[in-house]
Amino acid sequence: MTVVSLTALHTKPGPSWEDIQKHIKKGNDLARKHGAENVTTLVGMAAGTATGTLTILATSADWTSFGKSQDASLADPEMQALMADPNSPVATWDTYVLQTIPDM
């Protein structure tokens, strides 16, 4: 069963769109480096209170692949620095991990 990870980013007021894009691209590239598949950035266009929220989607073939990707990403000093950077344009994020339901 496919595992889908969604990370909703909540940006700080003030950063330029260019700075936000650079930050997201770096994180996406690191996620891909460590095995995340189908890494895609989305923005809520008609999403109620989530309208305008930037969301990163990534998939893994199964829970084993997801775990390996997460372990590798979180052990990477570049990812750690990106997540802990006080000058990041991202204030907070929420991650949701879901599993597909076959034959539905």
Give the predicted meaning of each segment:
Residues 15-39, 71-83:
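Short amphipathic alpha-helical segments
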Residues 2-10, 41-74:
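Short, well-ordered beta-strand segments in beta-rich or mixed alpha/beta enzyme
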Residues 1-14, 18, 102-103:
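Surface-exposed interaction/gating patches
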Residues 34-55, 78-104:
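Glycine-rich beta-strand-turn "strand-cap" elements at beta-sheet edges
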